[in-house]
């Protein structure tokens, strides 16, 4: 009969292995017709001003994907969400997220579902119930060695 410690250790290991992560990572800036700068100019604004680029209206929206978390900055609003599920769908990924504890009201957690499509290594689209937004990846544009 296995020891209780071994059983607990194995169960914790299996939960860690089941953690889901986003299919993309890093900083992404929205490509928006009301902000008619080229994608590389948008990313320069993000590199120069960071999150302030959004509040200064140099960039309409910025998203940071980090493992199972997504940080979204739009105007003066910043949100943090965590993946609840990710599934292949419609040539992309159907992602369901829940908002962080700071976004909860009376212990209720709001969920969001959308489709994320990877168009190429530097461009993604996010389709939600109301609209589609295209994003350009900010960071080194050099291919890895």
Where are these regions (language model features)?
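Sec-dependent signal peptide recognition
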Residues: 1-9
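N-terminal signal peptide c-region/cleavage motif recognized by signal peptidases
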Residues: 14-16
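Boundary of Sec targeting at the N-terminus
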Residues: 19-20
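Short, solvent-exposed loop/hinge segments that bridge or flank secondary-structure elements
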Residues: 24-68, 106-108
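Short, solvent-exposed aromatic-acidic interface loops
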Residues: 35, 76-78, 129-133
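Central antiparallel beta-sheet cores of small beta-barrel/beta-sandwich binding domains
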Residues: 57-97
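Beta-sheet ligand-binding and adhesion/scaffold domains
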Residues: 89-145
């Amino acid at each position: 009969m296995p020891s209780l410690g071994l059983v607990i250790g194995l169960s914790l290991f299996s939960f860690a292995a089941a953690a889901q992560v986003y299919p993309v990572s890093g900083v992404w800036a929205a490509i928006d017709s009301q902000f008619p700068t080229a994608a590389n100019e948008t990313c320069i604004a993000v590199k120069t001003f960071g999150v302030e680029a959004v509040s200064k209206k140099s960039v309409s929206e910025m998203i940071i994907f980090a493992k199972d978390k997504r940080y979204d900055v739009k105007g003066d609003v910043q949100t943090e969400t965590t993946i609840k599920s990710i599934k292949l769908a419609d040539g992309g990924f159907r992602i369901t997220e829940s908002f962080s504890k700071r976004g909860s009201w009376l212990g209720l957690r709001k969920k969001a579902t959308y489709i994320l499509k990877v168009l190429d290594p530097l461009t993604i689209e996010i389709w939600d119930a109301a609209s589609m937004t295209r994003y350009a990846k900010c960071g080194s544009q050099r291919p890895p060695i």
